[in-house]
């Protein structure tokens, strides 16, 4: 779950825990982002087995370069759809790196991968080999 204000991460995790949630991952990125950020530090708070832990990460831990917010900013839905299709088609850009950053963290935090670098590799492979584009196209066919 993305939280725009990093100071609310632990409080939000505590609320989720009191409400009976067993697992949750909350993230907040530099610049008030509700996702991990390529700008600099991002915080991750994990609720797992009743325990709340936190960590701070930077893009370099993922093997990625930093980027300004202006380089990854989206736009209206139509523009964002084009951006997503370009990323899923293998276009290399800071926007792709932002997808890799957040996908990698999800893969590590869910136990699918052991390191952020491995998460980036797996996510990058799915983008490069057409797996994600195929999935997008199947979803389009099923949409009303």
Name each region found by the language model.
Residues 1-144:
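Glycine-rich anion-binding loops and their surrounding alpha/beta cores
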């Amino acid at each position: 779950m993305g939280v725009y204000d990093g100071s609310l991460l632990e409080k939000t995790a505590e609320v989720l825990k009191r409400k009976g949630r067993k697992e949750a991952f909350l993230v907040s990125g530099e610049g008030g982002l509700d996702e991990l950020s390529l700008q600099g530090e991002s915080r991750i708070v994990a609720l797992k087995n009743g325990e709340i832990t936190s960590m701070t990460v930077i893009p370099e831990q993922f093997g990625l370069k930093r980027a300004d917010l202006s380089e990854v900013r989206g736009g209206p839905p139509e523009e964002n759809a084009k951006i997503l299709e370009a990323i899923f088609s293998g276009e290399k850009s800071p926007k792709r790196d932002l997808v890799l950053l957040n996908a990698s963290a999800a893969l590590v935090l869910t136990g699918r991968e052991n390191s952020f670098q491995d998460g980036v590799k797996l996510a990058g492979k799915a983008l490069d080999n057409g797996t994600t584009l195929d999935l997008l196209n199947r979803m389009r066919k099923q949409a009303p």
